Every structure is written in structure tokens, then in C-alpha cells.
Amino acid sequence: MQAAITPITRQPLHELAVDRLRDLIVQGDLSPGERLNERMLCERLGISRTPLREAIKLLATEGLVRLLPHRGAQVAPLEARRLADTLEVMGAMEALAGELACRQASAAQLAGIRALHDEMLAKYAARDLAGYFRCNQAIHLKIVEAGGNPVLAGIYRQLNANVLRARYMANLSQERWDAAMREHEAIMTALEARDAQRLTRLLREHLALKLAAVLNAVEKAA
């Protein structure tokens, strides 16, 4: 009897293009307001125009790209007021999620967040900002998911997609990056202790400090 053949699944080209184009925008290789040159991006990413255009449309739904009627697309400009409003809401959402997570997160979920935290610490020690940021974003999302409220998690993901570039910019300051790592150490300690009151305060403070750094970075980039 022949063994069942498991199909080899590959990530669709437009999904790969989304990931790579998102990184270019978030990490500043493509600047806010910059027009997207399709020919250059196709060559850089090694893809045709069809998956690139699909990727651009998807990133437009995330708020990272702005579609221009009959003129292509551009990297979405950073708007300080909108960023401030979004991060203010996200601070409240993370505080609520932290409170819920302290009550009901499983041991496996806490262990997973601890593993991500330790990986993030290693990226910080190696001064790998891109790697640090990926771990950082995963930690924030895992804390929200550990709260066990899928509606909260879904809205959080949508909002976070709109501020990825700004959140990355905040840690371009070494002083802010150092402070953010210390804040995450305290957040991890409070979460593992299931100290809801302390964790909610720390998460709110962390997002407030992030907001101040974001607005400072946006002002300098203007």
C-alpha cells in the first residue's frame, strides 16, 4: 500500500510580496509619501507586476499604502494626530487585554510569551533592530490574544497594522530602545506574577512613552 502523498504547499507570491514590501516600508527603506515605482520594486523583489499590485492593494487596507487614482500608489504619509489617536486607543486595549490575560492565560501561553521575550532580549543585545521589532510585535499580540477576547484581538490587529512604521521609528533612538527593553522586562515580570493591576499600569505607561517617542520621530522626519 502506497503512503499518502502530502502536497507541498508554498506561500503565494503576493503574500511573500506583502511581507517584503511591508518590511521595506516599516524599516524606512521606502519613505512616507514616496511614490511606489512598480518596475523598480519588481526587480528588487524578483516578482512580476501582478503579485506586486495585489500586495500593494493589501497593504492599502492596512493603511501602509495610499492608492492614487490613475497615478499608482505611495507610501502612506505619517499623520501625527491620527497616530496619537490610534496609540491612545491601543494603550487602553492593551491594558484591558493584560488584565484579562492575568486572569485566564494558560501556562503554555505564558511560556510562549517568555520565549519570545528571551529571543527579543537576544536581538536587543545583538543590536538587531529588525529582529527585535518582530519579536516585540509578536509579544504585544500574544498578550492581547492571551486575554481570550477574539473581538478585542481582531480590532487590535487592525489598528496595529496602521502604526507599524511609527512604532519602528520610535526605537531608532538608542535611548528610547534601551528604555523600551527595561519596560518589557517589568511587563514580563508582572505578567508571569499575574499581577493585573501592575501589568495594566505598565502597559498603559509603555504605550504612552511609545507615543511620545513616535511623535518626536515623526516631527524630526517631517
Model features per residue range: what roles?
Residues 1-103, 211-222:
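Short linear motifs at protein or domain termini
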Residues 12, 110-111, 177-178:
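Short helix-capping and inter-helix turn/linker motifs at the boundaries of alpha-helical repeat units
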Residues 53-54, 104-107, 131-133, 152-155, ...:
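Juxtamembrane/interface motifs at transmembrane-helix termini
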Residues 60-66, 159-161, 176-178:
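Mobile beta-alpha loop/short-helix "lid" or hinge segments that flank ligand
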Residues 78-84, 98-106, 123-127, 147-148, ...:
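A ubiquitous short alpha-helical element
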Residues 107-168, 182-188, 198-209:
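Conserved amphipathic alpha-helical segments that form helical-bundle/coiled-coil interaction surfaces
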Residues 163-167, 171-174, 211-218:
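Short amphipathic alpha-helical interaction/hinge segments
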Residues 191-194:
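Conserved short acidic donor-positioning loop in nucleotide-sugar-dependent glycosyltransferases
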